[in-house]
Amino acid sequence: MRGLIRCCLFLCFPVLLWAQDGVQVKRERVFTGSGLYGFMNGGAEQFLEYGVSRLTARDVVYKGEDYTLEIYEMPSPEDAFGIYSLHIFKCERTDALGCIDCLSPYQLQAVVGNKYVSVVFSSGSSAAKDAVDELIRLYLPMDGKEAPQIPEILGIRSPYSGAVKYLRGPISVSSASTSLAELLEDCPFTGVWFVGDRKADDYQALIYVKDQEALKRLSEKIPVSSCIRQGDDFIYIKGTEEEAADEDHGDF
């Protein structure tokens, strides 16, 4: 009889976990390193450039709504912010949950410590949107602790979402600015804080270089009028995105 009771308890325990907080986990998958290629249809290289170590993806049902919750574990809060800064788009609400976050019509994205989090609700219903804040709090503490350190030299204040990007390597730099990517082609760097003005095609870039040789090489490329400030391991510049030359199609 005791054995039967133990067996029943063992079988019931997963059900109790399943019912905890009202979240039904339909599927859970974990990916590490190059395993990310098996999950993403393109774009894995960008995440790997930022040093993602682990992705936990869950398809869940919460309050009758379907969600896909993805938690990417990054080396640092700055790396988490960097990948976040490249993926947010059309935010209806920003930095409202006690951390850096962006709510769009079908997705909530956030930076929580060294984690980049994406919660997609494909229905786009008002019910799904209303419950998404509660859902993310069940998995992560949205307390703003271990927030990314945005350099004060940039002069930016919260909300940070959409105001600045953190670029870790050639792939992310190319996605932000073609002219900056060309400037950094032969200058090793460790990270770039990028502030762009789409209307004027102007930008500012705080570039942290790998060594003094890279700093010297970069300084020689940049006009004095474009250098805002320079330190031992960084150079802060302003620039303008160059327009692509129009192809010559004759009279057509």
For each predicted feature, which ranges?
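Sec-dependent signal peptide recognition
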Residues: 2-10
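Soluble, non-membrane globular domain cores that form compact, hydrophobic packing
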Residues: 13, 17-68, 72-252
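Compositionally biased, low-complexity segments enriched in small residues
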Residues: 1-2, 149
